[in-house]
Amino acid sequence: MKFFVIALIVLLGLLQYRLWSGSNSLPEYFVLQKHIAVQQEGNDKLNERNQVLKEEIIDLKSGTEAIEERARNELGMVKEGETFYRVVGGERSVSSPSQ
């Protein structure tokens, strides 16, 4: 009977060692959970970006308005017969009334 109790205590000690400091231990589990959370957050951001790009592709395929808008904004193109005006902002000086 003593041998059986000693064997159980040794077995319990080995299991506790594996639980706290061996491979696949609890601290390692928590570190992996943090890595998974960070990776999931990155995946969510990439999924949002992919969705925006998919919508932009659909918009570009469906009509000419999106293409025209990109050409105007990114390439500075104008339609035939249009006049392009560039307004350059400068600093305004506020003059106070003289007394």
Swiss-Prot record:
Compartment annotation: Cell inner membrane
Membrane-side (Cytoplasmic) residue stretches: 1-3
Membrane spanning stretches: 4-21
Membrane topology term: Single-pass type II membrane protein
Keywords linked to the UniProt accession: Cell cycle, Cell division, Cell inner membrane, Cell membrane, Coiled coil, Membrane, Transmembrane, Transmembrane helix
Gene Ontology cellular component annotations, sorted alphabetically: cell division site; cell septum; plasma membrane
Intervals, Periplasmic compartment: 22-99
Any single GO BP term: FtsZ-dependent cytokinesis
Family membership: Belongs to the FtsB family.
Job description of the protein: Essential cell division protein. May link together the upstream cell division proteins, which are predominantly cytoplasmic, with the downstream cell division proteins, which are predominantly periplasmic.
UniProt-recorded name of the protein: Cell division protein FtsB
Taxonomy of the source species: Bacteria, Pseudomonadati, Pseudomonadota, Gammaproteobacteria, Alteromonadales
